[in-house]
C-alpha cells in the first residue's frame, strides 16, 4: 500500500490515505496525520502532472500559421518595446530583443511553445524587470541575446523539473497541487538571477556563455538541495 501510495493519481488520493491508515492501524480520527499524508500525496501526484503539462507544451512546435502563437509573439514585442512598432512580421527588428535572425520561430525549435510562453509570462508579470534586463543585455561589453538566453533558461528550468530537482522548492511553495503558474514563477526567478550573476561575473565575452551558464546552473542546483528552499521573485 505504501509503495503504491506515491504513484496514485489525484482522484485516488483520498482513498489511498484511508488505505494507508488502515494498513498501519492508525486511527481515522488522527486528523493531523491524515491531513499531512493527504497533502504529501497531492504534492507528489501534482509534481508528476505538472511535468507532463510542461512537457506537452514543450512538444508543441511554434507554428507561424497558428494565430494564437503569432499573437503571443507580437505580445512579447509590445511588452518589451512599447514605443517601437514592428515594421513587418519578418524583420531584423527581432534582434533588438535578442532573437538570432529576422524570424523568431526558428529560435523556438528546442523548447517549442514553452520557450515563448515563459518569455511572455515574465514580460507580462514583471514588465519593469523584463525591460530593465533587456536594457542590460544591450551592454556594449557584457551584452547578451535576451530572448535566446531566456529560451536557454527555459531549458534549464525544464531539466530541473524533469530530474526532480524542483521537488523541495515546489513542495514549499504550494501545499497541494503545483500548477503551471508555479513553473513560470521559478523561470522568472532564473531570468532575474542569471542577469545579476552574469554582470557580477563579468565574462570576457559572450563566447564564454556556456561556461558561465553551467556555473549558474550548479549554483541553482546547490540552492535546490536545501529542503526549505523557495526560489521565486515574490519571495
What annotation goes with each model-predicted range?
Residues 1-235:
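Extended acidic/polar regulatory tracts at the flanks of large eukaryotic scaffold/adaptor proteins
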Amino acid at each position: 500500500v505504501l509503495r503504491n501510495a506515491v504513484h496514485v493519481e489525484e482522484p485516488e488520493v483520498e482513498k489511498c490515505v484511508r488505505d494507508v491508515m488502515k494498513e498501519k492501524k492508525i486511527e481515522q480520527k488522527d486528523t493531523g496525520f491524515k491531513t499531512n499524508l493527504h497533502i504529501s500525496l497531492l504534492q507528489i501526484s501534482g509534481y508528476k502532472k505538472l511535468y507532463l503539462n510542461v512537457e506537452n507544451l514543450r512538444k508543441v512546435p511554434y507554428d507561424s500559421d497558428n494565430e494564437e502563437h503569432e499573437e503571443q509573439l507580437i505580445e512579447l514585442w509590445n511588452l518589451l518595446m512599447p514605443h517601437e512598432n514592428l515594421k513587418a512580421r519578418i524583420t531584423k527588428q527581432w534582434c533588438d530583443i535578442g532573437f538570432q535572425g529576422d524570424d523568431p520561430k526558428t529560435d523556438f525549435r528546442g523548447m517549442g511553445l514553452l520557450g515563448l510562453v515563459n518569455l511572455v509570462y515574465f514580460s507580462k508579470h514583471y514588465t519593469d524587470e523584463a525591460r530593465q534586463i533587456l536594457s542590460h543585455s544591450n551592454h556594449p561589453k557584457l551584452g547578451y541575446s535576451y530572448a535566446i538566453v531566456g529560451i536557454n533558461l527555459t531549458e534549464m528550468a525544464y531539466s530541473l523539473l524533469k530530474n526532480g530537482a524542483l521537488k523541495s522548492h515546489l513542495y514549499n511553495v504550494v501545499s497541494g497541487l503545483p500548477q503551471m503558474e508555479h513553473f513560470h514563477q521559478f523561470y522568472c526567478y532564473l531570468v532575474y538571477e542569471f542577469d545579476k550573476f552574469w554582470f557580477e561575473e563579468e565574462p570576457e565575452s559572450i563566447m564564454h556563455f556556456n561556461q558561465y551558464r553551467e556555473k549558474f546552473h550548479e549554483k541553482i542546483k546547490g540552492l535546490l538541495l536545501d529542503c526549505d528552499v523557495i526560489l521565486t521573485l515574490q519571495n
